[in-house]
């Protein structure tokens, strides 16, 4: 497959957030499923090509040994998950991975490091990686944990397009998942990113035992940011043996799709990213996510340390749906 890069327009900055009280978001979740999808698809078509998705690739540039105790995370040093801590990946390996992702059709390259917060020398190395990936013509995103004063500006100077820092869940449920980092810590980092002029990538995880009201609370937090994030990844919990959430009750797929739809309705200009958890979804469930307004997928066999549908399976799915990758002239995988 030929995957010559076609530039993608810069994201449209969302306007000042329309206020969505928690009660109004919760009402969306209560709509009949088909009514909710119809409304989400209408909103989606007002702002995007409904048959186009952006392909993103995610690379763990520093795996394991994280001091945080996020109950879902196999990279936490608090849990025995079989994930060993390693050092920061060398620049040449990162560039090689980015080239491979681009050759497979990805236009967006995300780099994640299992840190509580990056040290100055680490940030200098990441800045080099950002520059090298940007030189390939790819959109860049990093997730490095909490940022200290001046670090967001350093990343901006390196050319970073997006910084990912998820809220994970609603404030009311947050304490059941994480104790080593406060909700306000997350909001403070997001504010630094916004003030530095970097696009915000912020979403959450569902299927951690939260209620529907908690899922509404997460979306309400996101949509009422000023402005709401340009990029909203919605993750379905990937249960990893050794983490506290291993063995949690599996979320009804319709609830996950509802979350995608409500995110699309309340954040109409955002890229809503179908993120972790796709490996366990059927093709039909993924198609419903696209119907609900998801317009980006993470592409590649591994997301950080967890599985993801194989590249060829994604190509076949997009072909069957008559969808295409953003910036490419035809459905992914077609000649």
Curated annotation (Swiss-Prot):
The protein's job, in short, is: Catalyzes the conversion of dethiobiotin (DTB) to biotin by the insertion of a sulfur atom into dethiobiotin via a radical-based mechanism.
Which of UniProt's keywords are assigned here? 2Fe-2S, 4Fe-4S, Biotin biosynthesis, Iron, Iron-sulfur, Metal-binding, S-adenosyl-L-methionine, Transferase
Per its UniProt record, the required cofactor names are: [4Fe-4S] cluster; [2Fe-2S] cluster
Recorded metabolic or biological pathway in which this protein acts: Cofactor biosynthesis; biotin biosynthesis; biotin from 7,8-diaminononanoate: step 2/2
- Which positions are annotated as binding [2Fe-2S] cluster? 110, 141, 201, 273
Q: Which reaction does it catalyse?
A: (4R,5S)-dethiobiotin + (sulfur carrier)-SH + 2 reduced [2Fe-2S]-[ferredoxin] + 2 S-adenosyl-L-methionine = (sulfur carrier)-H + biotin + 2 5'-deoxyadenosine + 2 L-methionine + 2 oxidized [2Fe-2S]-[ferredoxin]
Which positions fall inside the Radical SAM core domain?
51-278
Give the organism the record lists: Bordetella pertussis (strain Tohama I / ATCC BAA-589 / NCTC 13251)
Chain's gene name: bioB
Subunit info?
Homodimer.
Relay the cofactor remark from the entry.
Answer: Binds 1 [4Fe-4S] cluster. The cluster is coordinated with 3 cysteines and an exchangeable S-adenosyl-L-methionine. Binds 1 [2Fe-2S] cluster. The cluster is coordinated with 3 cysteines and 1 arginine.
What family is this?
Answer: Belongs to the radical SAM superfamily. Biotin synthase family.
Which residues hold [4Fe-4S] cluster? 66, 70, 73
Instruction: Give the main EC class.
Output: transferase
What protein name applies here? Biotin synthase
Origin superkingdom: Bacteria
Instruction: Give one GO term, molecular function aspect.
Output: iron ion binding
């Amino acid at each position: 497959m030929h995957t010559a890069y076609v530039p993608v327009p810069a994201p449209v900055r969302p306007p000042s957030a329309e206020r969505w009280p928690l009660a109004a978001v919760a009402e969306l979740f209560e709509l009949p499923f088909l009514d909710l999808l119809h409304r989400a698809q209408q909103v989606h078509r007002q702002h995007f090509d409904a048959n186009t998705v952006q392909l993103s690739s995610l690379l763990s540039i520093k795996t394991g040994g994280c001091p945080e105790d996020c109950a879902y995370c196999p990279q936490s040093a608090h849990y025995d998950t079989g994930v060993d801590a390693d050092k920061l990946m060398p620049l040449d390996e990162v560039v090689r991975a980015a080239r491979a992702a681009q050759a497979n059709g990805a236009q967006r390259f995300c780099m994640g490091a299992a840190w509580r917060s990056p040290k100055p020398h680490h940030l200098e190395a990441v800045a080099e990686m950002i520059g090298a990936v940007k030189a390939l013509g790819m959109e860049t995103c990093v997730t490095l944990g909490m940022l200290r004063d001046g670090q967001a500006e350093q990343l901006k100077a390196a050319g970073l397009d997006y910084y990912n820092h998820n809220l994970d869940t609603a404030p009311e449920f947050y304490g059941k998942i994480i104790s080593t980092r406060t909700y306000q810590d997350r909001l403070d980092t997001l504010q630094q990113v916004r003030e530095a002029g970097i696009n915000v990538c912020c979403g959450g995880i569902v299927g951690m035992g939260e209620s529907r009201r908690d899922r509404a609370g997460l979306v309400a937090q996101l949509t009422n940011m000023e402005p709401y994030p340009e990029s909203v990844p919605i993750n379905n919990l990937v249960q990893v043996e050794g983490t506290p959430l291993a063995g949690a009750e599996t979320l009804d797929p319709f609830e996950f799709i509802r979350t995608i739809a409500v995110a699309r309705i309340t954040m109409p200009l955002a890229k809503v990213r179908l993120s972790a958890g796709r490996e366990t979804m059927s093709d039909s469930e993924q198609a419903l996510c696209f119907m609900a307004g998801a317009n980006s997928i993470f592409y590649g066999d591994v997301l950080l340390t967890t599985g993801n549908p194989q590249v060829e399976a994604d190509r076949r799915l997009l072909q069957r749906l008559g969808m295409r990758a953003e910036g490419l002239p035809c459905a992914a995988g077609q000649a």
